[in-house]
Amino acid sequence: MDTSRGIDSDLDHFLRYRLDTRYYVSPLNRLTFACSARWGYIEPMNTERIIANDQLFYLGGSANVRGFAENMLRFDTNNNPVGALSSTSGTVEARIDLGHQIELCLFTDSGSLGHYQTSNIPNGFRTSAGLGFRYLTPIGPVGLVYGFKLERESGEDPGRFHVSIGYTF
């Protein structure tokens, strides 16, 4: 739990709750399944019950739902990212050691935002699936992954490439 009390702004007066859990299992020598689930909620403590946009939860990008651009899981009519007071996301990833410090990853990511401060933003989970390769260096993996959006909305691109340094989780 994080607390924030703005110095000169009532917009930064809130409680932020977060839960992040991870699980890893290796049923075979060269195969690891990695699972992650995250939840967050912001409780406004100011009289207007409004939180500054830079303090809201956003989803999309290399850290969570990889089929989407950074923070673009939900967006407004002007194509600007929309944040929310609550966030739920999860990932299941298979990591396959191909030898020679190369790893293949297959994944599915899903996430949902809720309790928007603006109207006309749809609710519900958005999901992506994808694959990528990582080169395992002595200081951590460097990778290139592509996430495909499942159940694309009208006008959306099919997915997104992401370059990563380190594991997503």
Where are these regions (language model features)?
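Residue-level signature of outer-membrane beta-barrel architecture
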Residues: Y23-V25, A94-I96, Y135-T137, F148, ...
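A generic structural micro-feature
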Residues: V82-A84, N123-F125, G155-D157
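A short alpha/beta connector and helix-capping loop motif
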Residues: S119-G132
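Repeated loop/turn-to-beta-strand initiation elements of outer-membrane beta-barrel proteins
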Residues: L28-F33, H100-L104, Y135-L144
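Outer-membrane beta-barrel "beta-signal"
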Residues: L131-V142, P158-F169
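C-terminal outer-membrane beta-barrel translocator/porin domains of Gram-negative envelope proteins
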Residues: M1-L98, L106-F107, G114-H115
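C-terminal beta-signal and adjacent terminal beta-strands/loops
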Residues: T108-I121, I139, S154
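Short beta-alpha connecting loops at secondary-structure transitions
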Residues: N53, H115, R126-T127, V145-G147, ...
